[in-house]
């Protein structure tokens, strides 16, 4: 699997976990609240792990790729603001 595909898969997993954080209904009973609290702790731990892996992927890329990515982001923001 190429580096780009690994990075995209990590981002996809991250977004799935973030979506799960905010999608569930608000718990009503104490048991549901305890379960929800544990699920939140688990998901936040998953997010921290994925953030670390994403950061590692970014840092493992060469400085040229990183600079090019930052330049592309700046150009995209500039074109969005002009529209």
From Swiss-Prot:
Short motif (Nuclear localization signal and RNA-binding (RRE)): ranges: 29-45
GO molecular function (one): RNA binding
Residue interval(s) of motif Nuclear export signal: 65-76
Region span, Homomultimerization: 17-24
Domain of life: Viruses
Protein keywords: Host cytoplasm, Host nucleus, mRNA transport, RNA-binding, Transport
UniProt free text on domains: The RNA-binding motif binds to the RRE, a stem-and-loop structure present in incompletely spliced viral pre-mRNAs. This region also contains the NLS which mediates nuclear localization. These overlapping functions prevent Rev bound to RRE from undesirable return to the nucleus. When Rev binds the RRE, the NLS becomes masked while the NES remains accessible.
Purpose: Escorts unspliced or incompletely spliced viral pre-mRNAs (late transcripts) out of the nucleus of infected cells. These pre-mRNAs carry a recognition sequence called Rev responsive element (RRE) located in the env gene, that is not present in fully spliced viral mRNAs (early transcripts). This function is essential since most viral proteins are translated from unspliced or partially spliced pre-mRNAs which cannot exit the nucleus by the pathway used by fully processed cellular mRNAs.
The protein, known as: Protein Rev
Lineage of origin: Viruses, Riboviria, Pararnavirae, Artverviricota, Revtraviricetes
Gene assigned in the entry: rev
